[in-house]
Amino acid sequence: MAQLYFYYSAMNAGKSTALLQSSYNYQERGMRTVVYTAEIDDRFGAGKVSSRIGLSSPAKLFNQNSSLFDEIRAEHEQQAIHCVLVDECQFLTRQQVYELSEVVDQLDIPVLCYGLRTDFRGELFIGSQYLLAWSDKLVELKTICFCGRKASMVLRLDQAGRPYNEGEQVVIGGNERYVSVCRKHYKEALEVGSLTAIQERHRHD
């Protein structure tokens, strides 16, 4: 039986690397995979999933208007698909998460989704909210804060490196705009208005 998986984490936990490895494992066994990523995120070039360690794969793009079930069913009818993998799945809509559950339930194709659980305000993304609700399997990919604790929160930094938690939910950036930290240091950095000051304080504790 196929299942819907949600692999979630903070930033820089190796989500894209894990996706590419999963896709490779299927392909190595002669199975066909289809990879999707969000059209909104083109940091590494449109139409591909890239990891920070240099791996990459071509990918189909989705936006809020994409009919994922229809697309996948049409492609599956032409040539069998053995697994669908979705990067940046936090950008999925409620309807698209439902459609991916239909890919699993109606077409019997496993769907592996990789993305962030929460945004820089500590709020759930819509896609993540429904994946948490409807997935068969939830898997946390762990990364660590500068203090060594598990990083579960994402800080957004302005151009001067100051953390803030207001503004639009989606601003695409890499390491220079976002950093993963534990909950304690997320709260402290916002309170003090400086991640650097918190890091310095931690070094001297």
UniProtKB/Swiss-Prot annotation:
Superkingdom in the source lineage: Bacteria
Coiled-coil regions listed: none
Residues bound to Zn(2+): C145, C147, C182, H185
Compartment(s) where it occurs, according to its Swiss-Prot or TrEMBL record: Cytoplasm
One cellular component term from this protein's GO annotations in UniProt: cytosol
GO terms, biological process: DNA biosynthetic process; thymidine metabolic process
Molecular function GO terms recorded: ATP binding; thymidine kinase activity; zinc ion binding
Pfam families, per the entry: TK
Record-annotated active site: E88 (proton acceptor)
UniProt-listed InterPro entries: P-loop_NTPase (IPR027417), Thymidine_kinase (IPR001267), Thymidine_kinase_CS (IPR020633)
Annotated positions binding ATP: S9, A10, M11, N12, A13, G14, K15, S16, D87, E88, C89, Q90
Major site of localization recorded for this protein: cytoplasm
UniProtKB keywords: Allosteric enzyme, ATP-binding, Cytoplasm, DNA synthesis, Kinase, Metal-binding, Nucleotide-binding, Transferase, Zinc
Tagged with keyword Nucleotide-binding: yes
Family matches, as PROSITE patterns: TK_CELLULAR_TYPE
Activity regulation statement: Allosteric enzyme which is feedback inhibited by dTTP and activated by a number of dNDP and dNTP.
EC number in record: 2.7.1.21
UniProt-listed Gene3D superfamilies: 3.30.60.20, P-loop containing nucleotide triphosphate hydrolases
Catalytic activity: thymidine + ATP = dTMP + ADP + H(+)
Function per UniProt: Phosphorylates both thymidine and deoxyuridine.
Complexes and interactors: Homotetramer.
Protein family (similarity comment): Belongs to the thymidine kinase family.
Protein name listed in UniProt: Thymidine kinase
Organism: Escherichia coli O6:H1 (strain CFT073 / ATCC 700928 / UPEC)
